[in-house]
Regions:
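Bacterial Sec-dependent N-terminal signal peptides
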Residues: 1-26
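Extracellular-facing segments of soluble proteins and assemblies that are Gly/Ser/Thr-biased and enriched
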Residues: 104-199
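A generic structural motif
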Residues: 138, 213-217, 245
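Low-complexity, Gly/Ser/Thr/Pro-rich intrinsically disordered linker/tail segments
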Residues: 238-289
């Protein structure tokens, strides 16, 4: 009887394991691409499960405990731990170890600031559901911007800088038209105008997809935090993970909230502390049908 050398068996086992992991990574990436239209990785996906630790006794919320939008948000893809926070002009805003993680959300241009990202995420959710016609945003000044009206309008600014839509010949719906409108929405939004598009909610009711917004009297200076995920224990106590952008466009990222980068979880009191230094602040929820 001929025996296969042990080292050959080891090589075969290692190769089979590597191939299996590669195939599993491709399947995971394909599943994320179907759920998140912006996802571009082809061989793997980084998630809350793979990147973060859960405190003892806590678990993630399941689909029966959240709305479809909240559950979609809670499954968002992340970047690996070595990704720094880039800025739109090139270079870095933060080194990788200065934040918890970067959210895997492709972007390009100066309108992707901390006010713009929540609008961008809402637009991606509606696109995922093929409900683009429901995208509508009240800007800083002027006409409400909605996708159906946009398809038979052109965009101009008044002398006071207000958005005005002038009726023109109907255009066909397209990815180009959708993102062109999104760019205008983000460009003409500020902290205060963002609150005109959402409903105020008690901080204790906050859930994935909700916003924490604080701003000054004029509404031009402030902060926006986006609730990415929520965990709960048997006593009903909840912890949250938030993400944000920068006043000058940068990667959407999860700030370093604790000494351990793998522990992004904070309670409702700390959520409020993020924005309570501003004279106007609160927790808010999108009006999603």
């Amino acid at each position: 009887m001929r025996f296969i050398p042990l080292y050959l068996l080891l090589i075969v086992c290692i190769t089979l394991t590597a191939n299996s992991k590669a195939e599993s990574g491709k399947q995971m990436a394909a599943a994320f691409e179907e759920k998140y239209p912006f996802f571009t990785m082809k061989d793997t996906a980084f998630t809350f499960d793979s990147e973060f630790n859960l405190p003892d006794g806590y678990r993630y919320m399941d689909s029966t405990e959240l709305t479809s939008y909240q559950y979609w948000i809670s499954g968002f893809p992340l970047w690996h731990r070595y990704k720094p926070v880039g800025i739109w002009k090139g270079g870095k805003r933060f080194e990788a170890d200065e934040v918890s993680r970067v959210v895997n959300l492709p972007w390009k241009g100066q309108n992707f600031d901390d006010v713009g990202f929540p609008i961008y995420i809402l637009a991606e959710y509606l696109r995922h559901l093929h409900r683009e016609s429901e995208l509508a945003i009240i800007p800083r000044l002027g006409d409400t911007l909605d996708y159906p009206t946009w398809l038979h309008s052109k965009f101009v600014l008044t002398g006071l800088g207000a958005v005005k839509l002038i009726r023109v010949e109907q255009r066909d719906t397209s990815v180009y038209e959708y993102y062109k409108l999104l760019d205008i929405m983000m460009r003409h939004s500020i902290y205060k105008s963002l609150t005109a598009n959402v409903d105020s909610i008690p901080i204790e009711n906050i859930a994935p997809g909700d916003l924490l917004i604080g701003h000054d009297k004029q509404g031009r200076k402030g902060s926006v935090y986006f609730v990415m995920n929520m965990i709960i224990n048997k006593s009903g106590e909840k912890l949250y993970c938030v993400a944000t952008g920068c006043p000058e466009a940068c990667d959407f990222h999860i700030p370093l909230m604790n000494l351990n980068r793998d522990n992004p979880w904070i309670d409702a009191n700390r959520l409020q502390e993020l924005i309570s230094d501003y004279p106007f602040y609160g927790a808010f929820r999108w009006r999603i049908p």
